[in-house]
Design a protein with these regions (language model features):
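Metzincin-family zinc-dependent endopeptidase catalytic domain
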Residues: 1-74, 78, 99-103, 113-116
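Acidic, metal/ion-coordinating pockets
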Residues: 81
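Conserved catalytic/binding loops enriched for acidic/polar residues
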Residues: 84-86, 90-230, 234
Length: 234
């Protein structure tokens, strides 16, 4: 298939909330898509991805991210486009922060790879990829599926569930931002962005694209890479 996508559909009984059936569908060309993402977003900072074919272990990490995201959908998690919007941009160049949190607090965000990291950052220990699971994801799954044995009815669960929400309400790691379609009214809930300052983040991204355009022929000139070079130019 030439489709570059994956899905995590599920069938849910509206009477009980029980997930009756769920599956993860992965189209073949997702392999090419995740390679594009990794190359175009992180090649300036990562010598290991400066090729048209990713090393198997690196490609496996990229696919694992996609699969984890889709499994999240099968478990009823919606897109959380606020996953990275509360992270200070400079924290995404900080080794300690990125090793703990990656690029986002939720893999249900569209926060792919760390395009803010600059050449030399990886050598300092900066992580360039999303987390396996984010703080929000662990919390959301716990909220959805932790048994509340003291509650005898669904109605009795509500105060406890509300309490769990209140306990995290002041912590930006657990913020949720609904995906916006057609019109964007909330700048903190946007696809494909990183960090809390879009101007600063875009400036770092621009520097990386300039670096990539300057060196791309040195990295892949002897390969069949028309798509890579044209995407970089676009």
């Amino acid at each position: 298939s030439t489709v570059a996508n994956a899905m995590g559909p599920s069938w849910i009984d509206p009477r009980s909330g029980e997930i009756i059936n769920a599956s993860v569908t992965v189209f073949h060309n997702i392999v090419q898509l995740v390679q594009y993402w990794r190359f175009l977003q992180t090649a300036p900072a990562d010598e290991e991805v400066r090729d048209v074919v990713l090393r198997e272990d690196l490609l496996g990490d990229c696919i694992a991210y996609v699969l984890s995201h889709e499994v999240g959908h099968t478990l009823s998690l919606m897109h959380n486009m606020a996953g990275s919007s509360s992270i200070p941009v400079e924290s995404l160049r900080d080794p300690k922060f990125t090793q703990e949190f990656g690029t986002t607090y939720s893999i249900m965000d569209y926060a792919r790879n760390n395009y803010i990291a600059q050449p030399g950052d990886k050598e300092r220990g900066v992580r360039l990829t999303p987390p396996e699971l984010g703080a929000y994801d662990y919390y959301a799954i716990a909220w959805l599926y932790t048994p509340i044995f003291e509650a005898k009815t669904a109605e009795e669960e509500i105060p406890i569930l509300d309490k769990w929400i209140s306990e995290k309400s002041g912590d930006v790691k657990y913020r949720y931002g609904k995906q916006q379609f057609r019109r964007r009214f909330d700048p903190s809930s946007v696809e494909e962005d990183l960090g809390d300052d879009p101007v600063k983040a875009s400036e770092y991204g621009r520097r990386n694209l300039q670096y990539l355009l300057k060196h791309i022929n040195d990295w892949v000139a002897d390969k069949d890479c028309l798509l890579y070079t044209s995407d970089a130019a676009d």
